[in-house]
Amino acid sequence: MSQAIPQVGVHSEVGKLRKVLVCSPGLAHQRLTPSNCDELLFDDVMWVNQAKRDHFDFVSKMRERGVEVLEMHNLLTETVQNPAALKWILDRKITPDNVGIGLVDEVRAWLEGLEPRALAEFLIGGVAASDIAGAERSKVLTLFRDYLGKSSFVLPPLPNMMFTRDTSCWIYGGVTLNPMHWPARRQETLLVAAVYKFHPAFTDAKFDVWYGDPDRDHGMATLEGGDVMPIGRGVVLVGMGERTSRQAVGQLAQALFAKGAAERVIVAGLPNSRASMHLDTVFSFCDRDLVTVFPEVVNRIVPFTLRPGGDARYGIDIEREDKPFVDVVAQALGLKSLRVVETGGNDFAAEREQWDDGNNMVCIEPGVVVGYDRNTYTNTLLRKAGVEVITIGSSELGRGRGGGHCMTCPVLRDPVDY
């Protein structure tokens, strides 16, 4: 079993990254086809073996810098060896709403008969009608396969699990279990919640769950981790655009304030666009006082602040900011200003590099980031500003529109003095 994490908590965007959760490409990405990739939120199919090599390189480069990397398939394999954990997952995943009333017993029995490693792979990679052996196939499953085809899914794959940033957010001393925006991603949170609830690496750690519950219908409230940045000094940045809704932002702020976990939430109103689906696609920290931004979007952000107070019923005071977003962030950190590196190249190159996650950097310590190799203009500008840019291959990993920041969920990160 993996060693227990003695401590969890993310206290900045740039402090030394100690522990991080990732999810390697696998069966879910082998299930991507030209006919289903759009529904599964990928722009194209992947060359999966190359994606695995590039992701392994990404993990290796973080480990070389002293980061402990936790991998989701491994954690889930170990989690389902606990009978209580397996029951908890299957009770919630194998339901009439998910697989159909006639398939619950058969699909559950088939999954329970798998070895832990294979079970974890299918929980993330999905179950096709053809996966369940013919001798065990019921009349209902046979009709399902004959009508919809052998490549139809009893349980859909979760290829976006690779972007571990989104399903949960470690904010200071606690975590959120995020209700995701698109149906293709909503089942991811259940698996992450199971790991946090049952895996020894987390059961031995003390933390609060600030917001989110896989057993609850959150309605119009959606929250994704690419929009959430605990930056220090009790401040949390939250993007509000395509993926994160105002309903979730208010509830998250309310929960953080009620437990004294944060003093201020700065909300970044974003355009509703896939290119800027999360705040971290247009804005990320690369050093304690340096950010990289896509100005076409960041200059249009509508910033406002939530603080404890105001209406006694809700405990939140709201204020529209009269300064640009970057200036508001600098002021919140006690800085006169932030150094800004814009997406590089001319207008055409900048738009391309933003699309290819040029602003989606993950900081592994102050002034050291990991990003995609293809964003040569932006990487060069960051290096000229004194940032060490460690590059990884991008041709396959980027097909789901996520870079180094998206592919990492920090679990333990040091604070930064401001």
UniProtKB/Swiss-Prot annotation:
The keyword Hydrolase applies. The keyword Thylakoid does not apply. Its main location: cytoplasm. The active site is at 406 (amidino-cysteine intermediate). Coiled coil: none annotated. InterPro entries: Arg_deiminase. It is an enzyme of class 3 (hydrolase). Its EC number is 3.5.3.6. It comes from the Bacteria. Keywords: Arginine metabolism, Cytoplasm, Hydrolase. GO terms for molecular function: arginine deiminase activity. It holds the Pfam family ADI. Pathway: Amino-acid degradation; L-arginine degradation via ADI pathway; carbamoyl phosphate from L-arginine: step 1/2. One of its GO terms (biological process) is arginine catabolic process to ornithine. It catalyses: L-arginine + H2O = L-citrulline + NH4(+). It is found in: Cytoplasm. One of its GO terms (cellular component) is cytoplasm. HAMAP family: Arg_deiminase (MF_00242). NCBIfam families: arcA, PRK01388.1. Belongs to the arginine deiminase family. This is Arginine deiminase.
